[in-house]
């Protein structure tokens, strides 16, 4: 058994690669399952050895990719606490918030076999849970949109400003109404614990969705 710090083997970069790839798949699947966009813009693919739905819409894909591209350096430095997919009604009030809580251990204890051996299996379980989450959620009103929020640790502010200059992708402070819902229903979906990553996914659902 070997103990490593986060600096060894460029550990932060490994976690960021894994997590950003997963989050891209997860966001597409949430948008499909919750019918934020017409089903016709999605195509069936295979990720983590299970079928998923991925958007074919260039502008939508670019927004998701650009956001995660800018989040990636923050994950490398362990500056990200949450990534949130917020589904908004026509009045831009949140009806659902899919919250991915992320934590990375400061030390790793790994065996001689693969560092990542169990992680893909755990992420597959998240994807399968998202695929059937509509069974525990109420229907959303028509005409919904979405936005991606990133909750960072306080020390991340300077890093975000640097990334904004380099990537030419503006970070905007989230509106209070996007961040909070009054007395939402909380639905836990999945939790994982591995040597390199801990993650929890839950949904905050607005009690009254009709507009």
From Swiss-Prot:
The keyword Cytoplasm applies. It holds the Pfam family HORMA. Gene3D superfamilies: HORMA domain (3.30.900.10). It comes from the Eukaryota. Residues 13-203 form the HORMA domain. GO terms for cellular component: cytoplasm; nucleus; spindle; zeta DNA polymerase complex. Adapter protein able to interact with different proteins and involved in different biological processes. Mediates the interaction between the error-prone DNA polymerase zeta catalytic subunit rev3l and the inserter polymerase rev1, thereby mediating the second polymerase switching in translesion DNA synthesis. Translesion DNA synthesis releases the replication blockade of replicative polymerases, stalled in presence of DNA lesions. May also play a role in signal transduction in response to DNA damage. Homooligomer. Interacts with rev1. Interacts with rev3l. Interacts with fzr1 (in complex with the anaphase promoting complex APC). May interact with cdc20. This is Mitotic spindle assembly checkpoint protein MAD2B. The gene is mad2l2.
């Amino acid at each position: 058994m070997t103990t490593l710090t986060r600096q060894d083997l460029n550990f932060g970069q490994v976690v960021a690669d894994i997590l950003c790839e997963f989050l891209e798949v997860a966001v597409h699947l949430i948008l499909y399952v919750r019918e934020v966009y017409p089903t016709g813009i999605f195509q069936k693919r295979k990720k983590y050895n299970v079928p998923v739905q991925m958007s074919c819409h260039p502008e939508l894909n670019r927004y998701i990719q650009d956001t995660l591209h800018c989040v990636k350096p923050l994950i490398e430095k362990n500056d990200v606490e949450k990534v949130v997919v917020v589904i908004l009604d026509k009045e831009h009030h949140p009806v659902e918030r899919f919250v991915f809580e992320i934590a990375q251990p400061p030390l790793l204890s790994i065996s001689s076999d693969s560092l990542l051996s169990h992680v893909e299996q755990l992420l597959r379980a998240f994807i399968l849970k998202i695929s059937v989450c509509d069974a525990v959620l109420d229907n959303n009103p028509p005409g919904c949109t979405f936005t991606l929020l990133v909750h960072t640790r306080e020390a991340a502010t300077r890093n975000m400003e640097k990334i904004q200059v380099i990537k030419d992708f503006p970070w905007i402070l989230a509106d209070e109404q996007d961040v909070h819902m009054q007395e939402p229903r909380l639905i836990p979906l999945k939790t994982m614990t591995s040597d390199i990553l801990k993650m929890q996914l839950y949904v905050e659902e607005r009690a009254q969705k009709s507009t």
